[in-house]
Amino acid sequence: VLMEDVPGVGKTTLAVAFSKALGLETKRIQFTPDTVASDITGYTAFDRQAQGFTFHSGAAMTNILLADEINRTSGKTQSALLEVMEERACTVDGRTYPLPEPFAVIATQNPTGTVGTAALPVSQLDRFMIKLSMGYPDKAAMRSIMSDGSSSDPLADVKAVCTAEKLIEMQKKAKAVFVDDSVYDYISDLCDATRHNENISLGVSPRGALALCRIAKAWACYKGREYVVPQDVRDFFAHVCSHRISLSAKGRLSGLAAESVLDEILKSVKCPENEEKRR
């Protein structure tokens, strides 16, 4: 999960609250210009007592890795996350160490252009299943934040409502959700449309299509259904794909946002008949 927004809107607070609610082992790493790859993956050091090299695990050896302000470090350090996010493992000095199950990365970043930030590599962005934006709170929410936040810790009352075993069980249940061929074709058509749009220079990859399918299955499971309907795909199309596409020169000069281009694609691609109606 990648959360992007301006500083001060609660990205890190939400990430910490989410990890506490899951009740899983969590490690947090604050990305800075001097953060190195070994801070993430770990390192080996000679142990004089054991007369051998010992592996010291990094921040990635956990269930939930909170990567705060991920776009404030170097590209070399970012590359250490590629294997971690894709293969759920880290390789140190030629030896591969599997990460605990379940595993997820929750990252926060400020918009590119903010002082001290740099754009994440495309290969890394593509590994995030979904990108969310907090946005500014409305007047009522702002009043609640000021009245409650000034007197107590907003995270103090967050309790664990899940366990690793329960989460793995829910993941298996979501994977078993049925997807009709028409919905598979719909996802494929949507992603293909991003590759043939004059306002987009880089479209959604096959990995992105898989992510859209998986999150649609999870959403259907959450809704209490054993099958995916086209609306499940539409609900998350922009969230799954906005960080995976790159606008062309024409799109940028026109002042378009990735979300608006994706919204036009949603309107232009024919949606299959609702599966619920056919049942």
Per-segment meaning from a language model:
Residues 1-32:
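Walker A/P-loop
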Residues 5, 68-69, 80:
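Walker B catalytic acidic pair
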Residues 6, 40, 108:
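P-loop (Walker A) phosphate-binding loop of NTP-binding proteins
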Residues 46-67:
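Conserved alpha-helical scaffold flanking the Walker A/P-loop in AAA+ ATPase domains
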Residues 47-50, 73-77, 85-177, 217-222:
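Canonical AAA+ ATPase core
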Residues 157-212:
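Conserved AAA+ ATPase small/helical "lid" subdomain
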Residues 196-279:
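C-terminal engagement/docking regions of AAA+ P-loop ATPases
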